[in-house]
């Protein structure tokens, strides 16, 4: 756990492997969290999360991170998969004893809105984009697809759009 979102910042403490933490925000690839009374940042490289498959007909588990890689098997819609690592729109995961990659676009991850006045859902990943609606504080929404800069793609009340990563927490 570091004091700021940087490898060079002060190390506050070490969080044991396998510990469940709540992410209360994001900054340049770092998750903000509180552990043993200390608030700081953990590199997202060291975090695992679960995602739920949302693909009619299932999701292809591939041997590598791309559509050109061999299809190992199909993961059924609704299956919850562990995220081992991620990058360039692909998540490394395991299913039925096989390790491979799935497209991040077809995984749903529950996140909770952490903004006292609610969080604006925007048409695109920009503060100046059209505001579609406001999601109330404490609402759990499904985050899916790739992170675009500091924005997460979510759906709420039948509308899809983007919210700032600074105001969501992974459950």
Briefly describe each language-model feature range.
Residues 1-32, 54-92, 114-151, 166:
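Beta-loop motif signature
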Residues 6, 22, 32-52, 94-111, ...:
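Boundary regions of SH3-family modules and the immediately adjacent low-complexity/disordered segments
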